[in-house]
Amino acid sequence: MKIDVSKVIVIGSGAIKIGEAAEFDYSGSQALKALREEGIESVLVNPNVATIQTSYELADKVYLLPLKTEFIEKVIEKEKPDGILVGFGGQTALSLGVSLYKKGILDKYNVKVLGTPIEGIERALDREKFQKTMKKVGLPVPPSDAAKTPEEAIEIAESIGFPVIVRVSFNLGGRGSFIARSREEFEKYIIRAFAQSEIRKVLVEKYLNGWKEIEFEVVRDKAGNSVAVVCLENVDPMGVHTGESIVVGPSQTLTNREYQMLRDAAIRVADAIELIGEGNVQLALSPNSEEYYVIETNPRMSRSSALASKVTGYPLAYIATKLAIGYTLDELRNTVTGITTAAFEPSLDYVAVKIPRWDFKKFEEVNKSIGSEMKSIGEVMAIGRNLHEAFQKAIRMLDIGDELIGKYYLEDEPLENVLERLKKKEPYLLMHIAKALRLGATVEDIHKITKVDKFFIYVIEDLVKIAEELRKNPTEELIREAKRLGFSDWEIELLTKRKVKKKWKPVVKNIDTLAGEFPAKTNYLYVTYDGVENDIPKPKKPSILVLGAGVFRIGVSVEFDWAVVNFVNAIRKRGIEAAILNYNPETVSTDWDMSDRLYFEEITLERVLDIYEFERPIGVVAFAGGQLANSLAKKLENAGVKLLGTSGKSVDKAENRAKFSKLLEKLGIPQPEWISAESIDEAIKLAKKIEYPVIVRPSYVLSGTAMKVAWNEKELIDFLKEAASVSPEHPVLISKFIPGTEAEIDAVSDGKKVVGVTLEHIEGAGVHSGDSTMVTPWRTLSERNVKRIWEITYELAKELEIKGPFNVQFVIDKKPYVLELNLRTSRSMPFSSKSRGVNLMELSAQAVLDGELKIGVEGKYYEIPPVAYGVKSPQFSWAQLQGAYPFLGPEMRSTGEVAALGTHYEDALLKSWLSVKPNELPKTSALIYGWEKKNILKETAKILENLGITTYSIGGDIGEINISKQEAVNMIKEGKIDIIMTTGYAKDKDYEIRRLAADLNVPLVLDANLALELAKAIEWKTKTQEEFEIKELREYWIRKIEENVEEYAASVVLRR
């Protein structure tokens, strides 16, 4: 029986950060879908502009606002909802729900908490209350105690005895948690742990070294009926955060007795916290007996529940929403099968493996060991008929330039080096295990070091035996067995040094959650060589295959999933079937009902061609999924695949630096001068010729990694030495650094005309566009230059016969220079679309599928008119990346983004900046310092001083009070600094200050231009006494904005 609610406010999770990523876009989207089905109006508050959920496909109303109590209260006051869902936006949403409840805001406006009651949430998230609850119901917990001060925590640690693990209350991604083996180590990290807890509380617990970590996903309804949907087993033992662990589903090493015992405990945990909806229960099991402990529970959708949904095909978030609004399990149907109720526990005839992906190369001084705190950026999930195959696929999906039995495996080095990596817990455990076994380590040796169950090590040993046999005697029978166990053609060719003849075809299998026990029609598919026949017939209707974005990493995030889902919607609206190929368990695109067929598979040339042969689509879309899909464009075209949109040949011309440069020369379009050097001496000589400053990028490095600005010869030499090798095989590109204003155009072309949006960066040149704060409409560019960048954009579209979405980046110093052209969707396209109220992916569908843009405007190019100011801000995850030095440069380091719109620019800027964690406006003090752009920093300090804020500075006369570095450090530790504003790169001078700010959640502004803009916006808000504008997205789209903006934007009417 449904609860009587007609309007529900849903709290999102905000920007993507380490520990709180796209899994909440997926779960939130499912929740919105379930509400719409029930005819309940949904009001979503989430500043994450890049997600699917902040568009009207799913939500009825969308507010791009900071996730802070005062903003949510304003939305509640305005919208008057009668219910609130807080279990679908990660820790952020749960904490906000508790805060709204405790401040009496929910009672004041009569808003019901749907799902698990707030008392239950507190029993789960407050470590002390959780321990008491477990003891009360007779469930075992490890020896532990809660502390409210560092001194108390030290006493508890001493009484329990080292080693201990410290867990933080009301927190996500294990932030601030640590393992200490001594008092000295404990004292070093305890202050940071308290800073990362919203309620300043930690739990000190006995460290269960070498115990197995097991997770259950439990669904429970208001009547107390429960289902254990899946049991996931962590390959890594206790002490490694589950988000950092390799996870296998279903569990592989539990006996039936152990499984039933832990399942029973998980259901009792759900009962004890009065869970309504979905929760995740983590348990520790002794490897030597049946002793176990309950570790923790999350009474909400989590990373593990997104994974569990994709592992089993059981739509957890959708079912959890229905339970929250009052249904019981037996009243709900499992929408995947269509024939069983939600009370059926899924049964699997395959195995799924999740492996995280790290991006440590992009961060300086970062601690690379993995442990109790999350540092991974994304994750992959592989499905196989056997564990060997699933392990192999998962490593390929990470897209790290190697495979499980690949180049690293074959490189010779001392065994001790590899064992040392295993001891330090460095990423990509399976690759180190395989290499150690090849170099002579035994299963026992590896088990002793890693505490990984021998069962998993034996699986890797099987692969190593096959690999070594392939090197010696590659028979046809052996190659066939290697394919069954997940070896790719590339691996086999590397080992045998001969081409693989395609003699066998893989089969397509479906996931029905029932292990084939009941007939069920599902479209959730995977491909394997370990099978005899296809589970589904070859498709008969015309279809289009869309390649997804694959694993998220820095630079590739939910923006590309937004593009994939929007393009797929456009295909299906046109009556054509759409198939998606993707393997990211966190995303909306890998939701089985987003497409007509979902291939949960690797995005490699070999696998795309297998699926292309089976699916026989009318074309393949590679431009929506970002770099991974786009980089296959030319290879696919060469293999005879029909690509939709811009040709693979054109993509290659834009991607290849030398070819693109020649093209710009031919068209007479200015570009920063650049050269390619094959030795350090040549690089020094050529850099002198084009004059400093220069941007240096070694060519053999992935994803814009290792790009730096060198201001003089010494910096250039230092950097090239760091780059390890510069040679004819690894030339280094050196281009003139032009310190101007950066701008870009997000556009769509049908080959005849171009339509799009201009974006201006607030930070100066030399900061990666993904780390820049962007504003639209532009504010400081001249009319002449804006007209010129549009002309250039049109010329490039015409020359390269662009059909579909693309993005051009410029630096403007008196005149525009082209920096790069991306012939695909860009990171900023969701922002461009939502800031103007026009979906660029729908326009892309017009260009690609209908053959022309239907915009009803004559001329070559046209800018979509602005409806409001839009500001997009980057979200960094410095707090999670222990030791990393926070700074901005030509290499991207942010993990997510947020945005806000406003009638006034200042309002949009402040709301956008406040949507980034841990930003708060300064009340009494600011530390402002730097060794470059001093005039801008001085102006910033002056404005804040005039507003009554005390400004401090180190090593100069920027703020009103000059203090020593040590004084600054002490003030930060004592909580006496509200905000830190600095600029540039000065690791040898201020590493401790910046790192401390990240560790203690002090807002950190890393660019002088942005600091000044924020100071001016704070001044504007103080002087005008303006309240923050609380408007729903559509309210901006349907009304004119401030007259002067209207005139200002119209002064360059781009309809040439």
Swiss-Prot record:
Mg(2+) 2 binds at residues 296, 298. InterPro entries: ATP-grasp, ATP_grasp_subdomain_1, CarbamoylP_synth_lsu, CarbamoylP_synth_lsu_oligo, CarbamoylP_synth_lsu_oligo_sf, CbamoylP_synth_lsu-like_ATP-bd, CbamoylP_synth_lsu_CPSase_dom, MGS-like_dom. Pathway: Amino-acid biosynthesis; L-arginine biosynthesis; carbamoyl phosphate from bicarbonate: step 1/1; Pyrimidine metabolism; UMP biosynthesis via de novo pathway; (S)-dihydroorotate from bicarbonate: step 1/3. Residues 131-325, 661-849 form the ATP-grasp domain. Its EC number is 6.3.4.16, 6.3.5.5. ATP 1 binds at residues 127, 167, 173-174, 206, 208, 213, 239-241, 282, 296. Mn(2+) 1 binds at residues 282, 296. GO terms for cellular component: cytoplasm. Its cofactor is Mg(2+); Mn(2+). Residues 920-1056 are annotated as: Allosteric domain. Residues 537-919 are annotated as: Carbamoyl phosphate synthetic domain. Mn(2+) 2 binds at residues 296, 298. Mn(2+) 4 binds at residues 820, 822. One of its GO terms (molecular function) is metal ion binding. ATP 2 binds at residues 697, 736, 738, 742, 766-769, 809, 820. Residues 1-399 are annotated as: Carboxyphosphate synthetic domain. Keywords: Amino-acid biosynthesis, Arginine biosynthesis, ATP-binding, Ligase, Magnesium, Manganese, Metal-binding, Nucleotide-binding, Pyrimidine biosynthesis, Repeat. SMART domains: CPSase_L_D3, MGS. PROSITE patterns: ATP_GRASP, CPSASE_1, CPSASE_2, MGS. The keyword Transcription regulation does not apply. It comes from the Archaea. One of its GO terms (biological process) is glutamine metabolic process. Residues 400-536 are annotated as: Oligomerization domain. Large subunit of the glutamine-dependent carbamoyl phosphate synthetase (CPSase). CPSase catalyzes the formation of carbamoyl phosphate from the ammonia moiety of glutamine, carbonate, and phosphate donated by ATP, constituting the first step of 2 biosynthetic pathways, one leading to arginine and/or urea and the other to pyrimidine nucleotides. The large subunit is composed of 2 ATP-grasp domains that are involved in binding the 2 ATP molecules needed for carbamoyl phosphate synthesis. The N-terminal ATP-grasp domain (referred to as the carboxyphosphate synthetic component) catalyzes the ATP-dependent phosphorylation of hydrogencarbonate to carboxyphosphate and the subsequent nucleophilic attack by ammonia to form a carbamate intermediate. This is Carbamoyl phosphate synthase large chain.
